[in-house]
Regions:
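Amphipathic/hydrophobic helical signal segments and adjacent flexible N-terminal regions
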Residues: 1-102, 114
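Short, hydrophobic/aromatic-rich segments at coil-to-beta transitions
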Residues: 17-18, 69-71, 103-106, 126-133, ...
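Beta-turn initiation residues at beta-strand->coil junctions
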Residues: 23-25, 135-137, 158-161
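Short, surface-exposed coil-to-beta transition loops
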Residues: 35, 88-91, 116-119, 140-143, ...
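Short, exposed beta-strand/loop patches in secreted or surface proteins that constitute
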Residues: 94-99, 121-126, 146-147
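Acidic, glycine-rich flexible loop segments
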Residues: 108-142
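Mixed-charge, glycine-accented linear interaction segment located at domain edges/termini
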Residues: 139-152, 159-163
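Conserved small/polar residues in nucleotide/adenosyl-binding loops
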Residues: 172-177
């Protein structure tokens, strides 16, 4: 049963904390699947945080429109990694709602996944309180859906069209909501 989530900012707040992720990535061109795992830390960025002003400036948006956001750090590995290959990085998100309910709008990032330039995606929440994110890059586009199957279980599906043409399914688990606190 989906969790009741009022808006995208509430969805982000539920995502804050420490998570372990299991991933299955399907490389359509190679007709092969690759497994991976990550440790992820998500921290809330409150309205007025200087990092949100930085995201707004990089995306040519007004900081006054941003209602909040997150700072995300991760460390992981994939089955096909070469020696010394690292999957450690971080990014920041800022939310700009386009409706009064805060369930659709722009998701600003300081940089994209594949491209290191700032990027803005369109988000909306569906009837099951899943967060749908569509991001268009110069050479590709991605469609992602994030949702909570319970307070300690978050899921994500992702389809990338363009250079890599892959599909992913991710499972995020956390011990309990109170254990997700990041200090």
């Amino acid at each position: 049963m989906p969790l009741e989530i009022a808006d995208a900012l509430s969805f982000f707040r539920l995502s804050c904390g420490r998570w372990t992720s299991q991933r299955s990535q399907h490389h359509l061109l190679h007709r092969r699947a690759e497994a991976g795992a990550s440790f992820i830390v998500v921290e809330e960025l409150h309205k007025g945080d200087a990092r949100l002003a930085e995201i707004a400036q990089r995306n040519n948006e007004s900081v006054e429109r941003i209602v909040g956001g997150c700072w995300v750090r991760w460390s992981g590995s994939m089955a096909w990694d070469r020696a010394g290959e690292s999957h450690e990085d971080q990014t920041m998100f800022g939310l700009i709602p386009s409706d009064d309910a805060g369930r659709s709008g722009l998701l600003l990032r300081d940089r994209g996944y594949a491209e290191k330039a700032p990027v803005a995606g369109q988000f909306h929440m569906d009837a099951e309180n899943g967060l749908i994110l569509t991001t268009d890059y110069e050479m590709m586009s991605s469609l992602e859906r994030f949702w909570f199957a319970g307070p300690n279980l978050r899921l994500r599906t992702s389809t990338v069209q363009g250079l890599s043409n892959n599909a992913s399914c991710l499972l995020y688990t956390s011990p309990s909501p109170r254990d997700r606190n990041v200090s």
